Amino acid sequence: MTRLDPLADAMSTLTNGSMLGKREVVINIASKLIGKVLKVLKEHGYIDEFEYVDDGRFGKYVVRLNGRINKAGVIKPRFPVKVGEFSRWEKIYLPAENVGLIIVSTNQGVMTHREAKERGIGGVLIAYCY
């Protein structure tokens, strides 16, 4: 079976695993984008650690959860955002100010919306987590 959106599957796996109280989940399809998103989540304390496992097909990520994820999802369609427009999207996707993060793909890599604001660059919204 083909997966239409591996990032959406990964984010829903993280949300479901955290809601069920699991300590470890397996993301069945690995990609560079999923790896970069997991790295951002680890830097901000939403997951403990993750490991890439090569299974000879697509690869997998084994993620250790710490229970801090309440909701994680993708933003579709992937909206292009300028530097001054992040606050509008924060109100839509995050529950409160300074709670959670929006993950942005920029020309300088994948980062949070706060890092993009500090650097003064825009990008494309790809996911959120709180």
Swiss-Prot record:
Q: Does the keyword Mitochondrion apply?
A: no
Which pairs are disulfide-linked?
Answer: none
User: Which UniProt key words apply to this protein?
Assistant: Ribonucleoprotein, Ribosomal protein, RNA-binding, rRNA-binding
Name the InterPro entries for this protein: Ribosomal_uS8, Ribosomal_uS8_CS, Ribosomal_uS8_sf
What biological processes does GO assign it?
Answer: translation
> PROSITE patterns annotated for this entry?
RIBOSOMAL_S8
The record's listing under Pfam families reads: Ribosomal_S8 (PF00410)
The domain of life is: Archaea
One of the record's GO molecular function terms: structural constituent of ribosome
Q: What GO terms fall under cellular component here?
A: cytosolic small ribosomal subunit
**What functional role does this protein have?**
One of the primary rRNA binding proteins, it binds directly to 16S rRNA central domain where it helps coordinate assembly of the platform of the 30S subunit.
Subunit details: Part of the 30S ribosomal subunit.
Protein family according to the UniProt entry: Belongs to the universal ribosomal protein uS8 family.
Protein name, per record? Small ribosomal subunit protein uS8
Q: What species was this sequence derived from?
A: Korarchaeum cryptofilum (strain OPF8)
Gene label = rps8
